[in-house]
Amino acid sequence: MTYNIVALPGDGIGPEILSGTLELLELISKKYKFDYQLTSYDFGGAAIDSHGVPLPDDTLNACKNADAILLGAVGGPQWTDPNNRPEQGLLALRKSLGLFANIRPTKVTEGTSHFSPIKESRVKGTDFIIVRELTSGLYFGEPRHIDNQSALDSLTYTKKEIERIAMVAFELASQRKKKLTSVDKENVLATSKLWRKTINEISHEFPDVKVNHLLVDACSMQLISQPTNFDVIVTENLFGDILSDEASTIPGSLGLSPSASFSLEGPRLYEPIHGSAPDIANQNLANPFGMILSLAMCLRESFNFEDAASELEQAVYQLIKDGKTTKDLNGHYTTSDIFNELKKNY
């Protein structure tokens, strides 16, 4: 079988962290004996410059026909039109592909615990996943309205939308420590009341998974005070956006966190959670670990190469443990240095 992979370098540091990651992919494919076809397309700000829009039709069509999509980063200060921003391309891509589930792991290993702004004894052993609903809620609700005197956003969830994200979370939890935390604001919001009711109904299909409900404000506190207590967290779009960014501070750098976006069928999108960092673009300073770990997620989730994924992850964590890191992690290694070190494993 030949896997069809679409690369979206995007903006800022995106092209440099993705290009090195694709070189690693080539070496990994030879070691693990699989074939793939790779095509690269403009996306985000780069596509605005070349095509006038952040998500050109040819890019979207290629993504629809892919087995997996690897994205570098989008955005930058030079694209100022509020009606034609790079980030709108990402929202449109998620919607077009039905990428309703965003998966963000947060892991603190022996080599990374000292980077955390939180006391090392509190974060050591942290290993949880946030499952965020990605295509509904406040960000997509209608009607919406703004004028000089008032503004309106609409928060809407259907039972079906809650059921499908819950199934993803329960299945992940059943493969891990069998512990699921559902986060809502059930004491105030009608959507959260439906959310909690639906989670409880689906829990009967997974009797081995222990379900705990937390209000979002309590969860935001416990993520910092007791991060090792969590395994899988499931929540709606806005809450997930905030909590996953909060969680990304636990390992000590945005550059350490990968993510994946899933649909029920079709391609999955893999990307680091950090932004495009235009201030350090093209200077060989970017931390590529989040992009590399996103490739590991791709190998595991889209291609079922568990051994290849684990080997790559362990190689990254060993580099960090050995102090072979970029400037943001108090190291002196360049972006290309990191890739060259990892290539030695293949």
From Swiss-Prot:
Any one GO molecular-function label of the UniProt entry: NAD binding
A biological process from GO: L-leucine biosynthetic process
Names of required cofactors: Mg(2+); Mn(2+)
Cofactor note: Binds 1 Mg(2+) or Mn(2+) ion per subunit.
Keywords: Amino-acid biosynthesis, Branched-chain amino acid biosynthesis, Cytoplasm, Leucine biosynthesis, Magnesium, Manganese, Metal-binding, NAD, Oxidoreductase
GO cellular component terms listed in the entry, alphabetical order: cytosol
Gene3D superfamilies cross-referenced by the UniProt entry: Isopropylmalate Dehydrogenase (3.40.718.10)
Enzyme class: oxidoreductase
Sites where the protein binds Mg(2+): D217, D241, D245
Self-association state and partner proteins as the record states: Homodimer.
Purpose: Catalyzes the oxidation of 3-carboxy-2-hydroxy-4-methylpentanoate (3-isopropylmalate) to 3-carboxy-4-methyl-2-oxopentanoate. The product decarboxylates to 4-methyl-2 oxopentanoate.
Protein name, as recorded: 3-isopropylmalate dehydrogenase
Lineage: Bacteria, Bacillati, Bacillota, Bacilli, Bacillales
Gene: leuB
